[in-house]
From Swiss-Prot:
Residues 468-484, 505-516 have a biased composition (Polar residues). Induction: By interferons alpha, beta and gamma. Up-regulated by IRF3 and p53/TP53. A zinc finger (B box-type) spans 124-166, 183-236. This is Protein PML. There is a cross-link at K380, K400, K401, K476 (Glycyl lysine isopeptide (Lys-Gly) (interchain with G-Cter in ubiquitin)). Pathway: Protein modification; protein sumoylation. Zn(2+) 2 binds at C72, H74, C88, C91.
Length: 882
C-alpha cells in the first residue's frame, strides 16, 4: 500500500506510515495483497483488514513475519530489517549509539496478528480443531485453542476453562473478539524454577519483575518496593499517556514549520517560473547572438533553484522524519492502550520510554532557517541591464553610421583567441551594423621569447577615462579618426628577430612564458565566451561618454560615500605607491613559513574560477570608495557617490546593499579564488571591517576558497621588469594607459596580464594562494600596525602562522613578562634584514600597548594609544579560527 498524505484527515490513515518530503502519490487499493487464506470473507472482513493495515511491514507492505520495533518506532519484518543496515529504511534515522539491540520484538503486533488470524478462521467457517483437525465448534480463551465437540468434552473434564461456541463468536465484531481475548490474558511469575506457571498479582519494582506470593516472601531485600501489579501497569500506562500529550505540543510546532517549508518550496517554484517566463520574453526581443546569454541566465536560475531547493528539501526531510516518529509513537501508544495485554505493556515499556524521551528532546527551532525566495532578483537585474544595453546599442549603431567620428571611437577590449571565432564574431557584428575600423596596438611575438609591444600609443577607452577632462576626450576622438592597423599577433623568424628587437624597446623586460598569447582585442563585439566592459557611472565632474553596445554583462552599483577626496589625493597616492614599491614586493613575496590550506591543494582547485578583485580607499575617510571584480565572463563594479547625488543617480544604494550585491556576485560562482594585486595592504582589512559591520563576513568566507597574491606571481613570471607598478606593467605588456584611480581598470589589467602570462587556477598557484584565516588574522592585527607598535611585514608573518590580535593579548595577559617572547621565533627570517639596533619584534612597545589596553580604554586614549575596539570582532573571529 502506498504511503498516505502526511496530514490527511481520513480516519483510516496511519500516522506511522512512511511519507515523502513532497506530495506523495494517492493511496492504492489494498485488495490482492491480503494474506488471509479465505477466498470469500464476510462483509466485516474488509473493514477489519483496512483497520489493521498497521500490522503490515511499513517497508514492503507485506504481512510482517516476526515484526521488529525500531528505535524510531517504525515496524519492519525481519527480512527488511536485515537489508536495512544500520538505519531505518523509512526515515533514515540511525540506530542510537550504545543500544543493546537495534530492534525489539514487537510482541504486541505478533499477538494481535495471531488473534486476528483466529478470528478470520472463525468468521470464514473454516476453523479446524487444534488437536484432531476436525471441524471446530468451540474456542478456549485460556488455552487459545480451537476445539471440536469431542475434544471440548475432554478439555472441560480436566481443565474447566472458559470456552465459547464459534457460532456465538461469529456474531461478534473484531473489536469485541479482541477485547475478550485481551482480558483473559494472565501474568505469571517470572521465576523459571516453577514447574507449572504460577499466576501472580505482585510486582517488584526493585527487580522489575512480576512475582508470585512465595517468591515475594522469599525476596526480603525489596519488601518496600512491592506493589500490586495492576497499579504498576496503570502507572506505566499513565506515564506513556503523559508523554504522548507532551508530544502533541511538539507535533503542533513541527507541523507549523513543516507547513512553512512547504509554502516556501511552492513560493520558490513560482518565483522560478516567473523568472524563467520573464527571461524568455525579454530574450525574444534581442538578436540571435544574445541567445547564448539567455541559456546562461536560465542555467544560473536553475542552479540557484537547485541549490535553494536542496537545502529546503533536506530540512523538509528532517521535519518529515521527526513528524513521522512523533505520530508513530502516539499511534503505537494508543493501540497498545486498546489492544496490548498487560505482559506486552511490561515488556515494551522501557523501550518505548527511551524512544519517546529521545523524541521529546527534538527541537523544531534548530531546524528553522531564513527562507529566501528573493534570490532571483539579481538575475532580473542582469536581464534588465542586458536588454537595455542591447537596445541602446542598436540606436547607437544607427548614429555611428551617420557620424564617422563616433564610429571611429575605440571600443572596449575583448578576447577572441581563435581565428574562426574572430570571423564568426565579425560576421555577427556586420549583421548588426556595428563593424567599423578601430585603431589597434600591434603586438608581435618572438620565437623562444615573450610577446612585447612593437609600438604603443594612448588608447583611452570609456572604461579607463575617469581622470580625463572634456578637452582630452575631444583630442582623443580626433586622434582616433586616423587609420591605424589592426592588432596583429605574429610569430617572428630568427632572421627578423634582431631587426624587430631594434624597433621595439630593447630595455623592456619580457614575461617568462614561451608561448605567444593574444592580449585583449580592442575592437569587435562581445562574444559569448569573452567578457565585455560596461559603462561606469561617474561623478558630475567627470564628463565622459558611456560605452556603447558592448556593455551588456556588467552590473553597476553606486554606493553611498564620498569620492571627492580621491580626486584631491590622487597625486599623493601615486607618490606613496612609488616610494613603497620595494617594500610592497618584500611584503607580498611568497612565504615558505605558512601552512597551506587543504582546500587550496585540492585537485579540484582547477574548477574554482579566478576573480580579480581590487578596491580603493579614501585617504581622508578611510572608507571604501571603489570596488571592482572581474572573471572570464562577467564583471562587477561599485562606484562611490555622495549621498547628495542619490536623487540624481537612480542606481545609488547604501554601502550595505552594495556589499550584498558583491556577495551575490561571488555566490554565483563555485567558491572562487580572489586575486588581489597588493594582498597585504590596507584594503582587505577595511573590506573585512565593512563586512563585519553588517554581519556578513561569514557569508564572504563561505563564498570564497582563498586569496591569490598577484604581485609576487607576476614578479616570478617577469623577473626582469624595471617596475612592478600595475600601471607600468599594463603600459609595457598590454599597450594600455591604465588609470590608477579606477578599480575596474586595475582588475582588467590584472586579468589581461594573467592571460598573457598563462596564469590559470591549479596546484601550480598553491604557493601564492592564502587561506581566509591568514588574512583575517592580518586584519585583526591592524590596530597594532596603526599604533606603530608592529610593522606591517611582521604582522604578515604572524598572520601566516594564524596569530591574531586576541591571541597576542591573551598571551600577554597570562604572562606579562615573557608571554610574547615565544612569537619571536615566527619572525626569525625578518631579523637578518633589520639593523642590529632595531629588534625584530619590539616586545617592549607591544607590551606597553597591551598594558595600556588592559588598564582601561580611557587611560589608553589619554596616553595616545589607540584602542582597537573596532577590530575586536575580527580579532575574536580570527582567534577562534586559528
Amino acid at each position: 500500500m502506498e504511503p498516505a498524505p502526511a496530514r490527511s484527515p481520513r480516519p483510516q490513515q496511519d500516522p506511522a506510515r512512511p511519507q515523502e518530503p513532497t506530495m506523495p502519490p494517492p493511496e492504492t487499493p489494498s485488495e490482492g495483497r491480503q494474506p488471509s487464506p479465505s477466498p470469500s470473507p464476510t462483509e466485516r472482513a474488509p473493514a477489519s483488514e483496512e483497520e489493521f493495515q498497521f500490522l503490515r511491514c511499513q517497508q514492503c507492505q507485506a504481512e510482517a513475519k516476526c515484526p521488529k520495533l525500531l528505535p524510531c518506532l517504525h515496524t519492519l519484518c525481519s527480512g527488511c530489517l536485515e537489508a536495512s543496515g544500520m538505519q531505518c529504511p523509512i526515515c533514515q534515522a540511525p540506530w542510537p549509539l550504545g543500544a543493546d539491540t537495534p530492534a525489539l520484538d514487537n510482541v504486541f503486533f505478533e499477538s494481535l496478528q495471531r488473534r486476528l488470524s483466529v478470528y478470520r478462521q472463525i468468521v470464514d467457517a473454516q476453523a479446524v480443531c487444534t488437536r484432531c483437525k476436525e471441524s471446530a465448534d468451540f474456542w478456549c480463551f485460556e488455552c487459545e485453542q480451537l476445539l471440536c465437540a469431542k475434544c471440548f468434552e475432554a478439555h472441560q473434564w480436566f481443565l474447566k476453562h472458559e470456552a465459547r461456541p464459534l457460532a456465538e463468536l461469529r456474531n461478534q465484531s473484531v473489536r469485541e473478539f479482541l477485547d475478550g481475548t485481551r482480558k483473559t490474558n494472565n501474568i505469571f511469575c517470572s521465576n523459571p524454577n516453577h514447574r507449572t506457571p504460577t499466576l501472580t498479582s505482585i510486582y517488584c519494582r526493585g527487580c522489575s519483575k512480576p512475582l508470585c506470593c512465595s517468591c515475594a516472601l522469599l525476596d526480603s531485600s525489596h519488601s518496600e518496593l512491592k506493589c500490586d501489579i495492576s497499579a504498576e501497569i496503570q502507572q506505566r500506562q499513565e506515564e506513556l499517556d503523559a508523554m504522548t500529550q507532551a508530544l502533541q505540543e511538539q507535533d503542533s510546532a513541527f507541523g507549523a514549520v513543516h507547513a512553512q517549508m512547504h509554502a516556501a518550496v511552492g513560493q520558490l517554484g513560482r518565483a522560478r517560473a516567473e523568472t524563467e517566463e520573464l527571461i524568455r520574453e525579454r530574450v525574444r526581443q534581442v538578436v540571435a547572438h544574445v541567445r547564448a546569454q539567455e541559456r546562461e541566465l536560465l542555467e544560473a536560475v536553475d542552479a540557484r533553484y537547485q541549490r535553494d531547493y536542496e537545502e529546503m528539501a533536506s530540512r523538509l526531510g528532517r521535519l518529515d522524519a521527526v513528524l513521522q516518529r512523533i505520530r508513530t509513537g502516539s499511534a503505537l501508544v494508543q493501540r497498545m492502550k486498546c489492544y496490548a495485554s498487560d505482559q506486552e505493556v511490561l515488556d515494551m515499556h522501557g523501550f518505548l520510554r527511551q524512544a519517546l524521551c529521545r523524541l521529546r528532546q527534538e527541537e523544531p527551532q534548530s531546524l528553522q532557517a531564513a527562507v529566501r525566495t528573493d534570490g532571483f532578483d539579481e538575475f532580473k537585474v542582469r536581464l534588465q541591464d542586458l536588454s537595455s544595453c542591447i537596445t541602446q546599442g542598436k540606436d547607437a549603431a544607427v548614429s555611428k553610421k551617420a557620424s564617422p567620428e563616433a564610429a571611429s571611437t575605440p571600443r572596449d577590449p575583448i578576447d577572441v583567441d581563435l581565428p574562426e571565432e574572430a570571423e564568426r564574431v565579425k560576421a555577427q557584428v556586420q549583421a548588426l551594423g556595428l563593424a567599423e575600423a578601430q585603431p589597434m596596438a600591434v603586438v608581435q611575438s618572438v620565437p623562444g621569447a615573450h610577446p612585447v609591444p612593437v609600438y604603443a600609443f594612448s588608447i583611452k577607452g570609456p572604461s579607463y577615462g575617469e581622470d580625463v577632462s572634456n578637452t582630452t576626450t575631444a583630442q582623443k576622438r580626433k586622434c582616433s579618426q586616423t587609420q591605424c592597423p589592426r592588432k596583429v599577433i605574429k610569430m617572428e623568424s630568427e632572421e627578423g628577430k634582431e631587426a624587430r628587437l631594434a624597433r621595439s624597446s630593447p630595455e623592456q623586460p619580457r614575461p617568462s612564458t614561451s608561448k605567444a598569447v593574444s592580449p585583449p582585442h580592442l575592437d569587435g563585439p562581445p562574444s559569448p565566451r569573452s567578457p565585455v566592459i560596461g559603462s561606469e557611472v561617474f561623478l558630475p565632474n567627470s564628463n565622459h561618454v558611456a560605452s556603447g553596445a558592448g556593455e551588456a554583462e556588467e552590473r553597476v552599483v553606486v554606493i553611498s560615500s564620498s569620492e571627492d577626496s580621491d580626486a584631491e589625493n590622487s597625486s599623493s597616492r601615486e607618490l606613496d605607491d612609488s616610494s613603497s614599491e620595494s617594500s610592497d614586493l618584500q611584503l607580498e613575496g611568497p612565504s615558505t613559513l605558512r601552512v597551506l590550506d587543504e582546500n587550496l591543494a585540492d585537485p579540484q582547485a582547477e574548477d574554482r574560477p579566478l576573480v580579480f578583485f581590487d578596491l580603493k580607499i579614501d585617504n581622508e575617510t578611510q572608507k571604501i570608495s571603489q570596488l571592482a571584480a572581474v572573471n572570464r565572463e562577467s564583471k562587477f563594479r561599485v562606484v562611490i557617490q555622495p549621498e547628495a547625488f542619490f536623487s540624481i543617480y537612480s542606481k545609488a544604494v547604501s554601502l550595505e546593499v552594495g556589499l550584498q550585491h558583491f556577495l551575490s556576485f561571488l555566490s554565483s560562482m563555485r567558491r572562487p579564488i580572489l586575486a588581489c594585486y597588493k594582498l597585504w595592504g590596507p584594503g582587505l582589512p577595511n573590506f573585512f571591517r565593512a563586512l563585519e559591520d553588517i554581519n556578513r563576513l561569514w557569508e564572504f568566507q563561505e563564498a570564497i576558497s582563498g586569496f591569490l597574491a598577484a604581485l609576487p606571481l607576476i614578479r616570478e613570471r617577469v623577473p626582469g621588469a624595471s617596475s612592478f607598478k600595475l600601471k607600468n606593467l599594463a603600459q609595457t605588456y598590454l599597450a594600455r594607459n591604465m588609470s590608477e584611480r579606477s578599480a575596474m581598470a586595475a582588475v582588467l589589467a590584472m586579468r589581461d596580464l594573467c592571460r598573457l602570462l598563462e596564469v590559470s587556477p591549479g596546484p601550480q598557484l598553491a604557493q601564492h594562494v592564502y587561506p581566509f584565516s591568514s588574512l583575517q588574522c592580518f586584519a585583526s592585527l591592524q590596530p597594532l600596525v596603526q599604533a606603530a607598535v608592529l610593522p606591517r611585514a611582521e604582522a604578515r608573518l604572524l598572520a601566516l602562522h594564524n596569530v591574531s590580535f586576541m591571541e597576542l593579548l591573551s598571551a600577554h595577559r597570562r604572562d606579562r613578562q615573557g608571554g610574547l617572547k615565544k612569537y619571536s621565533r615566527y619572525l626569525s627570517l625578518q631579523t637578518t634584514t633589520l639593523p642590529p639596533a632595531q629588534p625584530a619584534f619590539n616586545l617592549q612597545a607591544l607590551g606597553t600597548y597591551f598594558e595600556g589596553l588592559l588598564e582601561g580604554p580611557a587611560l589608553a586614549r589619554a596616553e595616545g594609544v589607540s584602542t582597537p575596539l573596532a577590530g575586536r570582532g575580527l580579532a575574536e573571529r580570527a582567534s577562534q579560527q586559528s
